[in-house]
Amino acid sequence: MWLLPSFGIVMAVTSKPVWLEWTVVSLVKVLMTVTRLIPIRWSRALGKGVGRVLYRFNARMRRVAIRNLELAYPDWAPDKRRAVARQSVQSTAELLTEIGPLWSGSWSKTSAMLTVEGIEAVTEPLASGRGVIVLGPHLGNWELLGMHLATLGDLVALYEPLALKRVDRLVHRGRQRTGGRLVPTTPRGIAELVRSVRRGGITGILPDQVPKDDKAGLNAPFFGVECFTATLAYNLIKRSGAAAVMGTVLRTPTGFHAIYRATEEGVYSDDSLEALTAINRGVENLIVGNEAQYQWQYKRFRCRPQGPVDHYDWLNSPLIDEGRVSS
């Protein structure tokens, strides 16, 4: 399920007047056009600039990122956590400014900037007729990950329609431009996805997204911290018999680098908690060494039902030392 960047402007105006929707669509199109016409290094510089502003003025985003890094890396010095938190916000903003060349630019130009590691983890199961489920966390450019997967086989991905219909059409066109197909996040859509994977197709799932429904996950360790982990990917793997693969697309100085790795065997366990723990471990392995490109602004360490510790209860305090370990 490839989602729009979590701080996306369109999400904030889903119930606003039509004129505002037109304004948002126009701004998005202008941004896409500008970033499509300029070199990738310039669009990234623009994203970093936006990220610096967000980090400076969006206290909640900054505090969540620092808090998550405190939980994941308690041994890091406060200065290092703050630096990585700032880089993380900039990385998320870069994703927004990279959308233009990805959704409306030349795919041949984009693919020429993409190097790939471990592609056999995807192509070998497909060649044998087995479907593939790629688990791609909020790391690097997950939009490009979905687009690249669509060039490797028949991609069907879950998609939650946006209330802004014009923006929804824009997103659809962009995400399907390399041949992928989007289905709604409904029982019928999930059934269609499972059928496609059983026939030897591909899908992509964000394994580190916290579901709202208490019945849609289990609390499993992530960087040693118990947090709510979705069972969607696990259930799809069990229902479809697909091969599970970890995947990400990271930024490099000259473009992008895709990484595909077969998951550990624990992902296929009949014990759902063991499987979710293995999935989280796979996400950790992708993040380590690439922490600055992970979306730490997301409240990943939530528990459901609410556990004995709320890792984010202190965020509302007006007085806070953001360089202090606050656990």
Residue map of PLM features:
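Soluble or luminal CAZymes and related metallo-dependent hydrolases
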Residues: S26, M61, L114, T185, ...
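Membrane-anchoring hydrophobic helices of lipid-metabolizing enzymes
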Residues: L3-G136, D168-R173, R177-G179, E322-S327
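A conditional alpha-helix N-cap/helix-loop micro-motif detector
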Residues: A112-V116, L164, V183-P187, E226-C227, ...
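Catalytic core of membrane glycerolipid acyltransferases/transacylases, capturing the structured
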Residues: E94, S128-P187, R199, K212-P221
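Generic structural "secondary-structure junction" signal
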Residues: R56, P101, V116-G118, N141-G146, ...
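Non-catalytic C-terminal accessory region of glycerolipid acyltransferases
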Residues: S6-S15, W19, L54, R82-V89, ...
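Short amphipathic alpha-helical segments and helix-helix/interface helices
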Residues: I119-T123, G146-M147, D168-H172, L193-V194, ...
